Curated annotation (Swiss-Prot):
Function: May play a role in the release of virions from infected cells.
Domain of life: Viruses
The protein, known as: Non-structural protein NS3
InterPro entries xrefs: Orbi_NS3
Family matches, as Pfam families: Orbi_NS3 (PF01616)
Length: 218
């Protein structure tokens, strides 16, 4: 082997070494494996929530009835597929705003009815007291008869008593209906609030999306 061949072999060996780029692996960061929740697991969770709702007390009060409604809404959110859940969530947020406005109006109506009932009750008691005293005391009866020329004062007192009593009964009946509407509206708010909250949660209970511009509760 001559000197030229040895020099050519050495140069080709150096070129091969320069052409090889050393591989540096990226840094390793350990992460937890992503666990997927199957439909059967979601159905199992839904049944567990329904069992919790049925195993609680009989719902004698409004708060317990609202709790049962909330459990049912969460179970419904777990049963629904993801696209339907998102649609119901968006619709539920808008409906919650409307229900809150309606609830405020019902509470104002209830307050007005309470004021009317208070006034009518006081007038009824006063006129009943005057009418009863006129029956017992003859002097009061004579004064009410306006010097014997007529009993228009007495008729006015009795008419006012009858009117206020009728208004009191009517206002009480309307107030009962308003209370039922308020209880039903609060239950609807609890159901939709629970569904929206469940729809914005991942399978492990961590919140994924924050709700904005929506306030719940009283």
């Amino acid at each position: 082997m001559n000197l030229a061949s040895i020099s050519q072999s050495y140069m080709s060996h150096n070129e091969n070494e320069r052409s090889i780029v050393p591989y540096i692996p990226p840094p390793y960061h350990p992460t937890a494996p992503a666990l997927a929740v199957s439909a059967s697991q979601m159905e199992t969770m839904s049944l567990g929530i329904l069992n919790q709702a049925m195993s609680s007390s009989a719902g004698a009060s409004g708060a317990l009835k609202d709790e049962k409604a909330a459990y049912g809404a969460v179970a419904e959110a777990l049963r629904d597929p993801e696209p339907i859940r998102k649609i119901k969530r968006q619709v539920g947020i808008q409906t919650l705003k409307t229900l809150k406005v309606e609830l405020s109006g019902m509470r104002r109506k209830k307050l007005i009815l309470k004021i009317i009932m208070f006034i009518c009750a006081n007038v009824t008691m006063a006129t009943s007291l005057v009418g009863g005293m006129s029956i017992v005391d003859e002097d009061i009866a004579k004064h009410l008869a306006f010097d014997g020329k007529g009993d228009w004062v007495s008729k006015t007192v009795h008419g006012l008593n009858l009117l206020c009593t009728t208004m009191l009964l009517a206002a009480n009946k309307i107030s009962e209906k308003v209370r039922e509407e308020i209880a039903r509206t609060k239950r609807d708010i609890a159901k939709r609030q629970s569904y929206v909250s469940a729809a914005t949660m991942s399978w492990d209970g961590d919140s994924v999306t924050q709700l904005r511009d929506v306030k719940y509760g009283d």
